[in-house]
């Protein structure tokens, strides 16, 4: 109908983007903590409903990567529930998290709390984790979960990092 108008109505839509963040090796702990702080702010801004929400974060495996994950998790645990746009979106968020958490090789590090009964349509943050090999073997992990969830993907070396980057389809943003 819109395309039949003398002047068609343009549609500008961003339909599903995981907006990957690439955390590189060789950064000091202070910089990693700074990245975790910024990531927390971006992942939870507006209950994760911004189109630039970082849904996938690649980080180096090993001790420094583990400290990064702990820093990020501590910040996400302190995040209060925030309002979703409507109940249908909140339900889809819960279903998306449940689907991801059920995939082989994915661990649920911080589960979202159920808030359906409070009448406020709020959601809490969620953090999941996997490794690059598991990520590459399951295309469903490329799907966006709309809301305050983050999938952390550890990589062993630059070769694995490049493989994951090549597997990602077009994205609205990447950092």
Regions found by a protein language model. Give the residues of each.
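NAD(P)-dependent aldehyde/semialdehyde dehydrogenase
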Residues: 59-172
């Amino acid at each position: 109908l819109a395309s039949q108008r003398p002047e068609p109505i343009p549609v500008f839509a961003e339909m599903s983007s995981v907006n990957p963040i690439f955390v590189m090796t060789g950064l000091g702990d202070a910089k990693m903590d700074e990245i975790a702080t910024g990531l927390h702010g971006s992942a939870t801004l507006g209950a994760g409903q911004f189109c630039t929400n970082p849904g996938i974060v690649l980080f180096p495996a090993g001790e420094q990567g583990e400290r990064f994950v702990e820093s990020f998790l501590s910040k996400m645990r302190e995040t209060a529930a925030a309002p979703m746009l409507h109940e249908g979106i909140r339900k889809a968020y819960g279903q998306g998290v449940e689907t991801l958490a059920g995939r082989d090789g994915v661990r649920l590090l911080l589960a979202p709390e159920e808030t359906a009964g409070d009448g406020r349509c709020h959601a809490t943050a969620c953090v999941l984790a996997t490794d690059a090999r598991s990520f590459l073997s399951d295309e469903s992990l490329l799907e966006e979960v709309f809301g305050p969830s983050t999938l952390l993907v550890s990589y062993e070396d630059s070769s694995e990092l490049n493989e994951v980057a090549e597997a990602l389809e077009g994205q609205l943003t990447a950092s």
